[in-house]
Amino acid sequence: MNDINIVPYFEILEKINKKKNIKSKLHIYSLYNFNPLVLENYIKYFLEQHKINANFSKNAYDQIDQEILSSKFTKRIRNHRFLIIGSDINKKIFFNLNLVDQYFENLKINLKNILSKTKKFKKFNLIFFNSPTLLTSYYTSKSDFIKIQKKIQNFNFFLEKQSKKNKHLILVDIDNLSKLVGINNFYDQENYYVSKIPYTESANNYISQEISKIITAECNDRKKCLIVDLDNTLWGGVLGEEGIDGIDLGKTF
């Protein structure tokens, strides 16, 4: 992934609040363990560059488990084209190994529940955040820090395996994005303390553009390509035995 142009947030607000000629809306259901206001405004802006008018569901943040376990969850997401699950381990301030295990186990259960409840949906994609590395080792011992990083790697590997088995599951590689931006430049600690909005302007640009690319690609019609093995048909078969009479070929054959 190459460097991107960073769009300031004030420009985003100015442009998304202007009236657009885009009539149809794309419905997106989203659940996060942080305040997604800024991130979703960025996603909305970048989707509008592709003539896509995104409408995000209004859900309370940090209610992922409760929402997915709700008996009404399937009904709520049925009319949405995309479901985004964004959970960031660096916004869960714990460095206890058992709690980390529980955190990842909950995410695995949530993922399996969603895939089970949506397997009969025709036009539907689940966009799921993988886990970044820990922001700091300050609050834990070096040995525990290494163990937690290993658990993160194992969880991300689990997600990759699931995405290969489920065509409707698409991963957002937050781990890689955090390394591109720089883990220390990825999070805005002061803003998170005030408003529970975790990411810096640069991080929001990178994450939102990645998500908008995913959504745009899924919404656009895919072209099909037919590959013909001419070596064994025309050249070694018809042309080799019959000649070129009756076959329309260009002047460069």
Q: Model-found features: residue ranges?
A:
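Extracellular glycan-modifying ectodomains
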Residues: 1-251
